Structure formats: structure tokens, C-alpha cells
Amino acid sequence: MTKAKKEESEEVPETPSKSYDELLAYLNPIAKPLAGRKLTKKLYKCVKKAIKQKNIRRGVKEVQKFINKGEKGIVVMAGDTLPIEVYCHIPVMCEDRGIPYSYVPSKSDLGAAAGSKRPTCVILIKPHEDYQEAYDECLEDVQALPLPY
């Protein structure tokens, strides 16, 4: 007697994604400057293009290390990360070194944009000539956001 194998379905069940407005309810108090709906979408697209070139730094520890080494780029942080002590020092580091940063509403969407099944709370997008136009557009928009102080 053998066990019957379960048929593996090739279709991945889609999780119902929440709208931008629904995600805003989960933001933590330090999530400023928050990217708007259009800028969030642009940042996710830029992350997807950067991941193809392997031109991205993901995670608090890695981003912190490369900011300290003087690497330049755009820092994108998830606004729904708790506890905030995990990454509350990153904006100060960015401001000291003149690196533009922005918050997006969802860490799971940020992780998905980076090609990961796991949520990601901090990403550093480095410039590259293959997606320079999208990068420059995002850089301009992130620098135009008002700083929280």
C-alpha cells in the first residue's frame, strides 16, 4: 500500500492585495516622508528593474553597512514595520550623508517588488545605466518630498 500523492496545483493562489488607502491604516508614526500612490508605484518598478541588474541592497544590516561605506542611491523603507526601533536610525544616517529616502506603505509589497517571498523593510536602490531614466525620475520625486522636520 502506497500513499497517494497529492496533486500539486501549478496555479499559485493570489492573496487579495490591499489598496493604498487600506495600507495607510498600518503606518507607524515615523513614516515620513511617505511616497504618494504614484511615487510608490514608480519606486516598486525601479526596484524591479534594479533587482534584474543585481544593483540593490536589501535589509537593515546590509543597507546600514553600505551607507556607512559611502554608497549612494535611494533608500526605500516600509512604513508598516514594527517595532520601529529596528530601523529608526536609518533616516538619520541618510540625512547625515545626503542620501534621499522615502517610505512606502507595505513591507510585503516592497519585498515582492524585490523578488522575494519575504517582507523587506529597507532597500537601497543603486544607479545603473540600464534603468537610469526611471532611477532619475524616482530620485527627483523623492528629493521633492518634504522632510519631516
Swiss-Prot record:
Transmembrane segments: none annotated. It is found in: Nucleus, Nucleolus. It comes from the Eukaryota. Keywords: Nucleus, Ribonucleoprotein, Ribosome biogenesis, RNA-binding, rRNA processing. InterPro entries: eL8/uL1-like, H/ACA_rnp_Nhp2-like, Ribosomal_eL30-like_sf, Ribosomal_eL8-like_CS, Ribosomal_eL8/eL30/eS12/Gad45, Ribosomal_eL8/Nhp2. GO terms for cellular component: nucleolus; sno(s)RNA-containing ribonucleoprotein complex; telomerase holoenzyme complex. It holds the Pfam family Ribosomal_L7Ae. One of its GO terms (biological process) is rRNA pseudouridine synthesis. Belongs to the eukaryotic ribosomal protein eL8 family. PANTHER family: RIBOSOMAL PROTEIN L7AE FAMILY MEMBER (PTHR23105). Component of the small nucleolar ribonucleoprotein particle containing H/ACA-type snoRNAs (H/ACA snoRNPs). Component of the telomerase holoenzyme complex. Required for ribosome biogenesis. Part of a complex which catalyzes pseudouridylation of rRNA. This involves the isomerization of uridine such that the ribose is subsequently attached to C5, instead of the normal N1. Pseudouridine ('psi') residues may serve to stabilize the conformation of rRNAs. This is H/ACA ribonucleoprotein complex subunit 2-like protein. It comes from Xenopus tropicalis (Western clawed frog).
